[in-house]
């Protein structure tokens, strides 16, 4: 289950090589620390409480991830940080495994901070970390998108949890992928998702037949890495399907 930490950190590294937070680079390091603090605590807490309490925790954590990591909307950073949160929540661990998860995420945080500062140190931004919160305005299109995505993802997972359906994270990921900052893009993505989910199912079926059983646990990880390397939404959808079907195969055979 802790292999998901590697996927989460890898996706963050791939993004932070080029993306920024729209604030001073030194203050961007604070955003990275805040994001990783949420990734460490939020998923574990949400798995320790009843569904409605988990719903509230998800709202707070996802909203903070959006505020700290997604100010520069065109970077689509939410597809990395919120995805990481959902993956860690879906692959929950306890005890010594959780200790190892925390260590892995802290190491990942340091790596991300080094790469981010090295690549972004010459950015000319004057906005500070505090400004991300001071500038929050419910009337702005950006902040309305924050709220919309937060409540759609959290509500969808609440319904799954109330129905006692495992791995609620997958409906959260599906909702996140079509809840975009620019409304005109939503219809196109919704159409592509169905078509390329079918492609993903076909490729997964071939892999499931060809690969030995010892490789089955790694198909989901391959999907996570593929998402990080995919520039277009179509292939991101294909690789996301791997993870969902891996869980379905594990649960239902």
Question: What does each model-found stretch correspond to?
Answer:
Residues 1-79, 83-202, 206-222, 226-239, ...:
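Alpha-helical transmembrane segments and their membrane-interface boundaries
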């Amino acid at each position: 289950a802790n292999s998901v930490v590697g996927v989460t950190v890898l996706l963050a590294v791939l993004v932070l090589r080029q993306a920024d937070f729209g604030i001073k680079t030194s203050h961007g390091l604070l955003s990275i620390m805040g994001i990783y603090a949420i990734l460490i605590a939020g998923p574990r807490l949400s798995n320790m409480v009843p569904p409605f309490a988990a719903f509230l925790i998800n709202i707070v954590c996802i909203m903070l991830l959006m505020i700290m990591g997604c100010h520069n909307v065109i970077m689509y950073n939410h597809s990395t940080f919120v995805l990481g949160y959902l993956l860690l929540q879906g692959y929950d661990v306890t005890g010594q495994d959780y200790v190892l998860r925390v260590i892995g995420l802290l190491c990942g945080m340091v790596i991300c901070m080094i790469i981010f500062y090295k690549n972004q140190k010459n950015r000319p931004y004057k906005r500070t970390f505090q400004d991300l919160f001071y500038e929050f305005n419910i009337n702005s299109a950006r902040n309305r998108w924050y709220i919309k995505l937060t409540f759609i993802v959290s509500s969808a997972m609440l319904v799954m949890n109330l129905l006692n359906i495992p791995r609620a994270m997958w409906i959260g990921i599906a909702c996140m992928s079509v809840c975009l900052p620019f409304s005109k893009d939503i219809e196109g993505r919704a159409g592509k998702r169905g078509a390329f989910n079918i492609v993903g199912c076909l490729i997964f079926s071939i892999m499931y037949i060809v690969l030995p059983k010892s490789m089955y646990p790694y198909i989901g990880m391959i999907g996570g890495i593929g998402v990080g390397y995919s520039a277009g939404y179509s292939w991101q959808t294909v690789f996301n399907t791997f993870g969902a079907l891996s869980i379905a195969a594990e649960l239902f055979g």
